[in-house]
Amino acid sequence: MKLGELELREEWQDEEFPRLLPEEPGSPGDPEDPQRGSQAGTPSSLALCGQRPMRKRLSAPEWQLSLTEGTGENGASPTRSASSSSAGSLDLEVDELETPSDSEQLDSGHEFEWEDDLPRAEGLGASEAAERLGRGCVCDVAGEDGHRWRVFRTGQREQRVDMTIIEPYKKVLSHGGYHGDGLNAVILFASCYLPRSSIPNYTYIMEHLFRYMVGTLELLVAENYLLVHLSGGTSRAQVPPLSWIRQCYRTLDRRLRKNLRALVVVHATWYVKAFLALVRPFISSKFTRKIRFLDSLGELAQLISLEQVHIPEVVRQLDRDLHGSKGT
């Protein structure tokens, strides 16, 4: 009885599914049931394996026709070939997913190769280094008013600087080489080159001078940097207003504020120290701890090399007056 039930179930399976196939409409009417009943479980399993073309009507082979190019040329392929082709297509899809990520890593690595050349660019001025290191981030254009304009492009930002109006004050910022290992740039800020507050268009000049300094800093600074403020020879009329300093600090990019290792102030006068005390509430405590005061150029020479540092003559003269020949 059990064998008969098994045979009936096998006959039901053999009779039911082939009816769905249009190419085998006469299979249920064949008078070969006694022969099938005489076969044991092994022939029935073989018969089921032999009827594998009925699975070709499943959606898997047809999907492979639309998703891949190489699996749908023969629509009557057996399920083993369909399953192997689908597995192969899955392997190919995984490779395709990994390939873009590998290429993106290679592309992202090439974006920073130019920074490896920064330490070799020694002895450059601020504007020359910006043009040489910017790699297309800086361009000079002539305006309709006859002024020469410099355009700084950093990321998605664009700053236009009136170079004609700030030409006498460009020396306020200069590049002093590199300190230690790596890309630790030395940036000099000589306040003796700042304009006096009594000149015409003072606000306009200071605004474009600030744009010039920020644009040059973003091009020169690759990693950490040391900012040296040469405050010697600066009159009170040349000290910028508090609002300008506060605007500079707030507008300064976070990367430049974070990568600043130290702010070294040389020959700080009493009003410069008082000015820094007034600015302290507007700056962070971390930035305040980075400020360091030096009394002479000799102390500065112990901190950094002065071979590539451009020191104004008025600062050198002040240092000689204060400390004699041993100061430098």
Swiss-Prot record:
- What PROSITE patterns would the database entry show? CRAL_TRIO (PS50191)
Q: Which GO terms describe its biological process?
A: apoptotic process
Q: Cross-referenced Pfam families, in alphabetical order?
A: BNIP2, CRAL_TRIO_2
Point to the regions of Basic and acidic residues compositional bias: 1-22, 107-116
Domain (CRAL-TRIO): give its ranges.
162-323
Kindly give the CDD domains that the UniProt entry links to this protein.
Answer: SEC14
Q: In what ranges is there compositional bias, type Polar residues?
A: 36-45
| Region described as Disordered | 1-116
Q: What are the Low complexity biased-composition ranges?
A: 76-89
Q: Which UniProt keywords apply?
A: Apoptosis
In the UniProt record, does the keyword Plastid occur?
no
Provide ranges: composition bias, Acidic residues.
92-105
The family database entries (Gene3D superfamilies) matched by this protein are listed as:
CRAL-TRIO lipid binding domain (3.40.525.10)
Alphabetical list of InterPro entries matching this protein? Bcl2-/adenovirus-E1B, CRAL-TRIO_dom, CRAL-TRIO_dom_sf
Q: What SUPFAM superfamilies does the record tag this protein with?
A: CRAL/TRIO domain (SSF52087)
Briefly, what is this protein's role?
May be a bridge molecule between BCL2 and ARHGAP1/CDC42 in promoting cell death.
Subunit: Homodimer. Interacts with BCL2, ARHGAP1, MIF and GFER.
The protein, known as: Bcl-2/adenovirus E1B 19 kDa-interacting protein 2-like protein
Q: Please name the source species.
A: Mus musculus (Mouse)
